[in-house]
């Protein structure tokens, strides 16, 4: 883990919390659109592309947080053709003086959203598999909640580390 000051850790924690709040807003939007599909199944095809984009955005937001931590604390993103998958895997294990950011279970569930994001980027909306989309939407609240819980725990660790650094600075100044 790269050495960081207490202030830098607090700033990173604040940036992560900002992203988490955006993900919570997205959750409301996913539920709203899914409600439209449930309310009027005959128009479901109209809403599936919108829902797919929202699930794409969900994983992108999760990955944005992982990228912040990778660049700020780990020092760099993984490289190579499979860097997205490796980034996710790296954060499900303790590494270089930092705890795991994600539980193994959360990381496994996020793999499905990573794979789906790839599909959304490479297919036409009308080619989407509605059954897969429904399964991801059904799992979304629990996966989103688990991600939020895991990340908040990690942010708590960063804030405790920042407090220790501040106490050490105060002690050395005395």
Question: What spans do the regions from the language model cover?
Answer:
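Solvent-exposed interaction patches of small proteins and small membrane subunits
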Residues: 1-174
């Amino acid at each position: 883990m790269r050495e960081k000051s207490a202030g830098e850790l607090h700033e990173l924690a604040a940036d992560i919390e900002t992203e988490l709040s955006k993900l919570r807003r997205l959750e409301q939007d996913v539920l709203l659109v899914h409600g439209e599909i449930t309310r009027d199944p005959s128009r479901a095809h109209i809403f599936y592309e919108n829902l797919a984009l929202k699930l794409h955005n969900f994983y992108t937001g999760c990955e944005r947080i992982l990228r912040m931590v990778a660049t700020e604390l780990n020092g760099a993103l993984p490289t190579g053709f499979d860097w997205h998958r490796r980034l996710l895997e790296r954060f499900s294990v303790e590494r270089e003086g930092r705890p795991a950011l994600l539980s193994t279970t959360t990381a496994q569930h996020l793999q499905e959203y990573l794979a789906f994001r790839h599909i959304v980027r490479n297919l036409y909306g009308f080619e989407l598999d509605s059954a897969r989309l429904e399964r991801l939407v059904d799992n979304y609240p629990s996966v989103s909640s688990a991600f939020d819980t895991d990340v908040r725990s990690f942010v708590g660790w960063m804030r405790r580390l920042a407090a220790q650094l501040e106490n050490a600075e105060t002690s050395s100044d005395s």
